[in-house]
Amino acid sequence: MYYYLEIECESPVKDIFTCNKRRASKVVGNSFGGDHFNFRLGEIKLLSMDFPSSKVPEVEETSLGHGVVHLYRVFPSESHEFDAPGLILAILAIPLYMSPSDVLGFLGEKHCKSIQHIRLLKTKDPNRIMALLKFKDQASVIRFYTEFNGKAFSQIDPETCHVLHIDKVNIKYPMESSDSSSTEQQLVGPSSKPFASTTPALIELPTCVVCLERMDSSITGLITIVCQHTFHCPCLQKWGNSSCPVCRYTQKVQSSEFQSKCTVCCYDKDLWICLICGNIGCGRYHDAHAKQHYVDTAHCYAMELETQRVWDYAGDNYVHRLLQSETDGKLVELSTDGKSSGWTGSSATESKLRDKMGLEYTQILVSQLESQRLYYESHLSNMSQKLSRVNEELVLKTKIATASSNANTDLRSRVDISESKLKKRDDKLKRVSSQLEHLKHNYEEEKSMNENLLVRIQTLEKQNTTKSDQIVSMQFQINDLNEQLRDLMFTISASQEIQKMGQSEELQNGTIVLPNNSTVRSNSVKSKKKKKKKPVVPSSSGSLGTD
């Protein structure tokens, strides 16, 4: 459902979303509709909020002068029925306690990023703040409409957010000519389609007299009562009186301003009003203009204004009227304030009237019983249909339950098998754990034994090193002693040879030469590998000198 917005104001604005103003002459008097006073005429204020690169938008207030805001509903054709929506949405009936900052907080930072411009239209009437939102893309429009349509403004108050798709915004200036009197703002998008240049073909949405809001059957429920006045269903529920709010007000005004008179002769007594068209005429005891109205129009029901009794010209008798009591809800007869012009006090007439009243009561009772029978039969048929649907659902649920039970049994058997396998694995795990503990204990014992052996080996290695050093030192001592022994043996053998040789002059003047210690030591190492040789005694001639 799409809507068309028309703003008729004094101050010209070229574009409502850019607020480029032109010079406007001062308007004197009522330029909206000539001499006819428009009760909706009032001052219109425009609050502009744009979203530039900065995060916080600037709020500018512009006065459009006195004017009227019209909202029309557009019925799209079949070819344009499934077109994508435009880029403009309208929020109706924003509460007065919400400031522009509250509106921004209600919209949220996420949606404000996808909005280019926000315009708030304020009028003098309460709850008449309308917000126009222009978005950057159609996806944001659809997402915003889905999320915010029907959303409550706050958790305390019952007001809800009503979001509408606006296809076109038209601004009219009554002081200019018809060709240049309006500045139209047309959306560019797949849903844009041409509109008529004039608005007589469009139907403006009516206003509820209780809450002063637009009445749209696609948004809220509407109810039309007997007097053909239409209201919002919640508004009529809040109205405590049983009478119509409009009729009650208009009847009070009429009764205070003037007195009812016959429309033909202006007679102000014994008046009868037609229940079909509301014509007032005098009774048959004056000029019988009420009956003449029945002859001319065939409107057979007329009510006497003094006694509130209804006369049937076709049946030539009074209509029996029953009212529902407000206390217990029973049907009671309408009481009369006085006798009518055709009432007689004779017992025959009273008996005849009682018979007619009884017959009418019987007819009413029969008709009510018939309507109740039809109602309860339809109710029983609905209940039987519901019962059949419930039985079908029960059969389906029984099948589903049986299948679920079979699946549950299968799952239980699988669970039992899995539990037995799990138990076996637990036993095996326990055995492996005990073996692991035993091996760990053996490992600890072997580890302690290895540590002890390692300490012992280190001690033995130290002892071995010490013994090796001792052996080396003793070997040196042995070598030294061997050298000394060799020298001693050499000396002894030499002395013996000398003694054998006798007292010769060569031996007396000779010199004994001994080898160095270093040579002896090096030769001692080689002597370990070779056989020990007998020392050679040098000749006395080579080693001894003469005096």
Swiss-Prot record:
Binding positions for Zn(2+) 1? C262, C265, C282, H289
Keyword Zinc applies: yes
* Alphabetized Pfam families for the sequence: BRAP2, zf-RING_2, zf-UBP
For bias kind Polar residues, which ranges apply? 514-523
Q: Where are the zinc fingers (RING-type)?
A: 208-248
Where does it mainly reside?
cytoplasm
Q: Where in the cell is it found?
A: Cytoplasm
Statement: the UniProt record of this protein carries the keyword Metal-binding: yes
Protein's name according to its UniProt entry: RING finger protein ETP1 homolog
Q: Which organism is it from?
A: Schizosaccharomyces pombe (strain 972 / ATCC 24843)
Give the source lineage, highest ranks first.
Answer: Eukaryota, Fungi, Dikarya, Ascomycota, Taphrinomycotina
